[in-house]
Amino acid sequence: MKVRSSLKSLKGRHRDCKMVRRKGVIYIINKTDPRFKAKQG
């Protein structure tokens, strides 16, 4: 999982990417292609 300063660009990389916020940490999750996982915060 990558830690990124900007997640907006990652969200547009794949159509199944979803942004999820848990306890103030923002995650990009992708069920079909897990290599797009990222987190911020």
From Swiss-Prot:
GO terms for cellular component: ribonucleoprotein complex; ribosome. GO terms for molecular function: structural constituent of ribosome. InterPro entries: Ribosomal_bL36, Ribosomal_bL36_sp, Ribosomal_L36_bact. The keyword Ribosomal protein applies. The keyword Ribosomal protein applies. Keywords: Ribonucleoprotein, Ribosomal protein. Coiled coil: none annotated. Pfam families: Ribosomal_L36. It comes from the Bacteria. Belongs to the bacterial ribosomal protein bL36 family. This is Large ribosomal subunit protein bL36. It comes from Caulobacter vibrioides (strain NA1000 / CB15N) (Caulobacter crescentus).
